[in-house]
Design a protein with these regions (language model features):
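RNA-contacting regions in translation and RNA-metabolism proteins
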Residues: 1-197
Length: 197
């Protein structure tokens, strides 16, 4: 591809399963150039030359972007992603999608998700929307039970605190009384008592 050789188009990332499939992220500083179109060529002529050179290895060419959710969605194509949850600290991404898109996102023997993971340098977990809902319900229940046990509050108050974003004992201990008392059914005195526990 002449544009790559000339430096007009830059290869940002490559992930390969040699002999089977490759994913390549390309980018151009020149907004008038479509990096994917330039690499694919007229009716696929440019990419087909490379595919033939690699003895039939399939090549997915993806437009690189700094927007990680978009890059992940593109790299897991043709699956349609509902939600992307990113944990920058642990370099992990949770992908939420429908049951119908699960096999597309994972690919044969996990190839699609494995290559997307290599391409982005993030560990990727794929969950159906049902699994995500069950996980969030379990987390909510665990957090509520922790508050009930450690703060000696009833279930309603525990659920209320968790639903308002106070998900740990430390968060409550470090909170200002006026932030907790903004919650319906909690006055300043109760808030102060919760913080002191």
């Amino acid at each position: 591809v002449p544009e790559i050789y000339e430096g007009t188009i830059e290869i940002k990332s490559v992930a390969r399963d040699p002999g089977s499939r490759a994913k390549i992220c390309v980018h151009s500083q020149d907004s008038s150039i479509d990096p994917v179109g330039a690499c694919v060529g007229m009716r696929g002529s440019r990419v087909q030359t490379i595919v033939n050179e690699l003895h039939g290895e399939k090549i997915d060419i993806i437009k690189w972007t700094e927007d990680l959710p978009t890059l992940i969605s593109e790299s897991l194509s043709p699956a349609e992603i509902q939600k992307v949850l990113i944990d920058q600290d642990n370099k992990r991404i949770d992908i939420i999608l429908t049951e119908e898109n699960l096999s597309k996102a994972i690919g044969r023997r996990g190839q699609n998700v494995r290559l997307a993971s290599k391409l982005t340098n993030y560990e990727i977990d794929i969950l159906t929307d049902k699994e995500d809902s069950e996980r969030r319900q379990a987390e909510f229940k665990d957090r509520t039970e922790t508050l009930i046990k450690n703060l000696e509050v009833d279930e309603t108050l525990g659920q209320l605190l968790v639903s308002e974003g106070f998900v740990s004992i430390d968060e409550i201990a470090q909170a200002e009384p006026e932030n907790i008392s903004k919650i319906d059914a909690i006055d300043e005195e109760t808030a102060q008592e919760l913080i002191s526990r």
